[in-house]
UniProtKB/Swiss-Prot annotation:
Catalytic activity: orotidine 5'-phosphate + H(+) = UMP + CO2
Database matches in PROSITE patterns: OMPDECASE (PS00156)
Active site as annotated: 95 (proton donor)
Organism of derivation: Cupriavidus metallidurans (strain ATCC 43123 / DSM 2839 / NBRC 102507 / CH34) (Ralstonia metallidurans)
Protein name: Orotidine 5'-phosphate decarboxylase
Keywords: Decarboxylase, Lyase, Pyrimidine biosynthesis
EC number: 4.1.1.23
Highest rank taxon of the organism: Bacteria
Stated family: Belongs to the OMP decarboxylase family. Type 2 subfamily.
Molecular function as annotated in GO: orotidine-5'-phosphate decarboxylase activity
Biological processes per GO annotation: 'de novo' pyrimidine nucleobase biosynthetic process; 'de novo' UMP biosynthetic process
Protein's pathway: Pyrimidine metabolism; UMP biosynthesis via de novo pathway; UMP from orotate: step 2/2
Lineage per the UniProt record: Bacteria, Pseudomonadati, Pseudomonadota, Betaproteobacteria, Burkholderiales
Length: 272
């Protein structure tokens, strides 16, 4: 199945728009795992098993693995998700952006080494920096558009022909870049007005929406701004609020409870 097909099936099967971000910070791991070999994989595996029936996707953030020399554990994790929970897509959050020849190797990293179903990329260097990822049939390419961090406004609100840059990116994705239906866009929950504008521009294109949970994005405003006519169209990401709900032995159950509550809150407004 393609990334888009997997995502659509997961929306329906798990009745969920929730994406759980896998950002394993060694300083916040459960006390019982601190300093143990393979702790990053073990922690993420427990989170995955506790939440897989509640989510539409998992999103490992590559920097949390690379900074700990845990690339092998990231490979192991993606393989585990595919084997133990088939049908739940894995988005590699890498935010890559480089010239085409270098992007070819980043695409190999994402799709051949890590075997992710989708990857996040930056559009700043133009279409030729993204085309190597699109050369992989069925893989998702999720483009930064209006990010959740406050500093995103420094660039994303610069005016281009009377429009903010993030709108120009959304229009380019819709009109020129998404020829094979592989693209999605990143739009932060911290900016619901911009979510609504991007949805208006791109139609039913999937939106990856970080910023609820620890970043404080409003779930009701996010869902109402970003949902498609059938109540889907979004991967609403929560990382820290779920991952670090507890540092005790009950951490996986605590994570499940927060994920369940988050899914239920999303669905309250999704179907309302």
């Amino acid at each position: 199945m393609t990334f888009t097909e997997q995502l659509s099936a997961a929306w329906q099967r798990n009745d969920s728009l929730l994406c759980v971000g896998l950002d394993p910070d060694p300083a916040k791991l459960p006390l019982s795992m601190t300093g143990t070999g393979g702790a990053i994989f073990s922690f993420c595996r427990e989170i995955v098993d506790a939440t897989a029936d509640l989510v539409c996707a998992f999103k490992p953030q590559i920097a949390y693995f690379h900074s700990q020399r845990a690339e092998d554990q990231l490979e192991q994790l993606v393989e585990y998700i595919h084997d133990a929970h088939p049908g739940v897509p894995v988005i590699l959050d890498a935010k890559r952006g480089d010239i085409g020849s270098t992007a070819e190797h980043y695409a190999i990293e994402a799709f051949e080494r890590y075997k992710a179903d989708a990857v996040t990329v930056s559009p700043y260097m133009g279409f030729d920096s993204m085309s190597p990822y699109l050369a992989y049939p069925g893989k998702g390419v999720i483009v930064l558009c209006r990010t959740s961090n406050p500093g995103g406004s420094d660039v994303q609100f610069l005016q281009v022909d009377g429009k903010p840059l993030y709108q120009v990116v959304a229009e380019a994705a819709r009109e020129r870049w998404n020829t094979n239906g592989q693209m999605g866009l990143v739009v932060g929950a911290t900016f619901p007005n911009e979510i609504a504008k991007v949805r208006q521009i791109v139609g039913d294109m999937p939106l990856l929406i970080p910023g609820i949970g620890a970043q404080g994005g409003d779930i009701e405003a996010t869902v109402k701004a970003g949902r498609t006519a059938d109540g889907t169209g979004m991967m609403i990401n929560s990382s820290r609020a779920i991952l670090y709900a507890s540092r005790e032995k009950d951490f996986a159950l605590a994570a499940r409870n927060v994920a369940l509550q988050t899914r239920e809150t999303i669905n309250r407004y999704r179907h309302g």
